[in-house]
Amino acid sequence: DMKDYIVKSLDRIEWVANDILEQKELLDFDEFARRYEANVRAMIKEKDLIALKSIIAYTTGLEVKVLPEKEVREGYYRYLCDRTSRADEKIIRDYCFCKACEICQELDIPMQVHTAFGDSPLCDLGKCNPLNMYEVINAYKDTKLILIHAGYPFCEELGFLMNHYENVYG
């Protein structure tokens, strides 16, 4: 009997970015950034989310870089010209992940991150090691990062991160 339980949701940030990038209208970077942040915030509010979720491990990998805006802006425009560029897609996905971490920090909700081996055909196991998140973990020390699937097969690495960083959970 579930009547005594409250069920809450979380949702993927990648869907928000994908919806914007797949529109026929080409946006300048400032408008993309504005819409992404506004849409993530709206998703949290409308769905009463208790966390955000990312599958970045399965798209461009866990080595998320905190990049200067100039570099993100340039990568965004290159990506609009060549949507097959994995390097420029990574720049955009890293930017979106970092922006979501900022929102999570501000709203005091966690970011749930898929780690370990996934089911996507784009998944590169070497890019799924939780230790690859070193830069972003340090950059967003006030964002709670829940690294799920025990980092398998990198369980020891996930344990190391949980032991050394107060903002990392598994």
Residue positions per predicted region:
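Active-site gating/metal-coordination segments in enzymes
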Residues: 1-110
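Catalytic pocket-lining loop regions of alpha/beta-barrel enzymes
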Residues: 61, 75-170
